[in-house]
């Protein structure tokens, strides 16, 4: 194995031996390759082992045909949501969270390491954030939580349901630019009995007018962004906070790319391209955004995400 501090942009940077090992895994064969028509199977393997250069992706016939194939809803609900809706859409994340529905090749996405890391990251947030809210609550009668790019906000809904002692003093503002996410979130919050605590607003996370937030959850938002843009986004979120507030943000690590390059390859085809970072880079993003380190945690199974806790200084 090689250092995770080496700069790796995408699956092409993973050594050929590692890619050959990955494409030959039992899971890839059972839940992906064996289900593909012969032509698609051959294209899939060839495009993974002998990829087009980055500047040729848009015109590479294999990539184009594979994208058209995976865009079919009866083939994959996950890939369909990414391709036909938008990359990083809440619809794809909801499917990964719930491991449903199961179309032709979706079992692969739900069982692969990178796919399983998404609900595992959600569970890690649900497990680690309540004590932060309690800590803030020691000094404040009400805690104002902001979730930019919230999607349905499954994380905060579960946190409030699982921790009734903090529910009565927690007010949450969920911001998303997808109306479908807003509608789903409101429905889920109402069903869970926490709709009085959670307000959903359709808006742009970069154009908010808040200055008094106590806690921000920015989960999954900077994963596709270059470091310089990630800093800009986290800085903007910091501006919505009071001094001493806590910001929790996550970033996908290069470990995901190294250990599951096949899934990262499929994500590239679908247009959901992540910017895989090192732990050092994630820490630097926090520092340059005006945050003092106050801890971190990860998705426990595979540790594919670094989740930083920073204090606004």
Regions found by a protein language model. Name each.
Residues 147:
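Class I SAM-dependent methyltransferase core
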Residues 2-65, 109-133, 140-143, 153-171, ...:
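Class I (Rossmann-like) S-adenosyl-L-methionine-dependent methyltransferase catalytic domain
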Residues 224-237:
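A short, conserved alpha-helix within the catalytic core of class I
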Residues 236-243, 289:
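Conserved helix-to-beta-strand junction in the class I
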Residues 136-137, 241:
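A generic alpha-to-beta junction signature in SAM-dependent methyltransferases
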Residues 217-221:
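A short beta-strand submotif of the Rossmann-like class I SAM-dependent methyltransferase core
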């Amino acid at each position: 194995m090689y250092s995770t501090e080496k700069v790796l942009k995408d699956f092409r940077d993973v050594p050929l031996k590692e890619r050959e090992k990955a494409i030959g895994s039992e899971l890839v064969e059972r839940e992906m390759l064996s289900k593909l028509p012969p032509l698609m199977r051959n294209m899939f393997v060839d495009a993974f082992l002998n990829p087009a250069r980055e500047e040729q992706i848009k015109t590479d016939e294999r990539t184009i045909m594979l994208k058209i194939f995976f865009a079919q809803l009866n083939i994959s609900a996950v890939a369909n949501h990414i391709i036909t809706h938008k990359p990083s859409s809440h619809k794809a994340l909801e499917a990964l969270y719930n491991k449903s529905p199961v179309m032709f090749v979706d079992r692969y996405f739900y069982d692969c390491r990178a796919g399983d890391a998404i609900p595992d990251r959600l569970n890690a947030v649900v497990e680690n954030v309540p004590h932060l809210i309690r800590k803030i609550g020691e000094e404040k009668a009400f805690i104002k939580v902001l979730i930019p790019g919230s999607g349905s906000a499954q994380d905060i809904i579960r946190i409030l349901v699982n921790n009734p002692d903090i529910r009565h003093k927690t007010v949450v503002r969920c911001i998303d630019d997808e109306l479908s996410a807003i509608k789903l979130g409101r429905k889920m919050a109402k069903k869970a009995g926490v709709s009085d605590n959670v307000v959903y607003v359709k808006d742009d996370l970069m154009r908010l007018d808040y200055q008094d937030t106590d806690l921000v959850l920015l989960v999954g938002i900077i994963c596709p962004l270059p470091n310089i843009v990630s800093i800009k986004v986290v800085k903007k979120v910091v501006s919505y906070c009071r001094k001493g507030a806590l910001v929790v943000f996550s970033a996908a690590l290069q470990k995901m790319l190294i250990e599951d390059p096949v899934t990262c390859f499929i994500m590239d085809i679908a247009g959901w391209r992540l910017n895989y970072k090192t732990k050092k880079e994630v820490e630097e993003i926090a520092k340059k955004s005006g945050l003092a380190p106050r801890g971190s945690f990860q998705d426990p199974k595979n540790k594919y995400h670094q989740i930083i806790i920073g204090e606004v200084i």
